[in-house]
Amino acid sequence: MHETEIAAIEAREILDSRGRPTVEAEVILSCGAFGLAQVPSGASTGSFEAHELRDGDAQRYGGKGVLTAVTNIKDHIQPELVGLNALDQADIDQTMIDLDGSTNKSKLGANAILAVSLATAKAASEVLNLELYRYLGGPLANLLPVPLMNVINGGAHANNNVDIQEFMIVPHGADSFKEALRWGAEVFASLSQVLAAQNLLTGVGDEGGYAPNLASNQAALELLVEAIEKAGYQPGAQISLALDVAASEFYKDGQYTYDGAAHSPKELIDYLDGLASKYPIVSIEDPLHEEDWESWGNLTAQLGDRVQLVGDDLFVTNPIRLQKGIEQQSANSILIKLNQIGTLTETLETIDLAKRNSFTSIISHRSGETEDTTIADLAVATRAGQIKTGSLCRSERVAKYNRLLRIEDELGSQASYAGAVGLGPG
């Protein structure tokens, strides 16, 4: 047996950061090297995402158990992969895709397939004695991403009256990732003081951002500008803002309901254009419904030369959806979530397609996260230049930032911060 062959695969049901079950897999090679991976789970999910398999047994975890996915790994995936070379990631992933046989990984579960896919890459990097980012990215894996830090939550991520799902700070003006992280943490602390001074709640949402009850979406933007200035930084020049509108969540029958009233797509486009003119907004994610391709094209024509327009629910990390966006000139950026497509190989192919067509890529977490830090390595490996992994609190978020600090340290003088070399947003 060759030392890089897969000898066994373990799997178990664990908990994510919301206390809901998710899948963990361990791929063990014949030489004893192993890789461990946990998969995340989203709250606002796009309709076209790969299928997350849940048990549906109301007696366990309200039907959200993942024992079926775990069993699929042990009984179906393991027998097919044992004996295969862990260094051939594409072969491993294709074997699982073929075994599943469905268009959206609904037979075995994208959560089962992804856990094994990521654990395989980690086992392979260990047997080669390489860090994961170096194994996946080769000698050019030295670009640290600009973080888009979600510090105020609304929409589906919080129980408040703010329509926009995420308000982010983007410290692109820093010289290093370490400095960018410090800036973000200082603004987050400053925001806490600004909220407290206005008697607003400082409890946090799923991704560690504050979820105060605010009068409007503009009120959130005003708070962020104030917090940035209070921390001693310049809004726009050093730290900009980004939004995740998650517009599919407040879309019905061709209308968008926000600020207490229904609006047409054109009105929403003009509304966002107005916000981007008034505030230092460099990136807007999911500004329109995931099937409103025409409006996406109109928005991109109107705003695309000034603002990064990011497709998340629109593209769901799917190369076929992305190709349509490229052809129709809908958006100019894609959010990358491993569990939307379900294998590492397909994720890398989607990032490559984006890059070849001058779309930016943002590597992203999900609202239900784990201590797994794969996305930090993926951001560096692919030179994406941007990462979305939540706020500056909750250890499942901070784990990714801390991993990036270690990578930057390890790279030493070779490390380059995307914001400092003009490869981030802003």
UniProtKB/Swiss-Prot annotation:
Keywords per UniProt: Cytoplasm, Glycolysis, Lyase, Magnesium, Metal-binding, Secreted
At which positions is Mg(2+) bound? 244, 285, 312
Can you cite a GO biological process for this protein? glycolytic process
Compartment(s): Cytoplasm; Secreted; Cell surface
- Keyword Lyase carried by entry: yes
Q: Which reaction equation describes what this protein catalyses?
A: (2R)-2-phosphoglycerate = phosphoenolpyruvate + H2O
Give the GO cellular component terms, alphabetically.
Answer: cell surface; extracellular region; phosphopyruvate hydratase complex
Q: Which cofactor does it need?
A: Mg(2+)
Molecular function via GO: magnesium ion binding; phosphopyruvate hydratase activity
Per the record, the pathway is: Carbohydrate degradation; glycolysis; pyruvate from D-glyceraldehyde 3-phosphate: step 4/5
User: Has keyword Ribonucleoprotein?
Assistant: no
NCBIfam families in the record: eno (TIGR01060)
HAMAP family referenced in this protein's UniProt entry, alphabetically = Enolase
Record protein name field? Enolase
**Protein species of origin:** Acaryochloris marina (strain MBIC 11017)
What is the gene name? eno
